[in-house]
Amino acid sequence: MSKNLKLKSARAAKDMSQKDLAEAAGVTRQTINAIESGDYNPSIQLCVAICRILGKTLNDLFWEDEEA
């Protein structure tokens, strides 16, 4: 699994720490860190919650860009 730089960038754009995002999503900071590091595959429910908090879509944050 690759690092999720899109999530990290979106979180930083909202001036949120991993702890801030974790608290808003109801998970631990370690969970957010693991998602951003590519070490954890979150549930669809958690993905949707993170998207709502950051004002992004699933496509924006979690789907891989297809190479043409």
Give the location of each predicted region.
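DNA major-groove recognition helix of helix-turn-helix/homeodomain DNA-binding modules
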Residues: 45-60
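Short, charged recognition helix plus adjacent turn
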Residues: 13, 52, 62-68
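Recognition helix of helix-turn-helix/homeodomain-like DNA-binding domains
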Residues: 27-40
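Short amphipathic helical patch at the helix-1/turn junction of helix-turn-helix
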Residues: 1, 12-13, 40-41
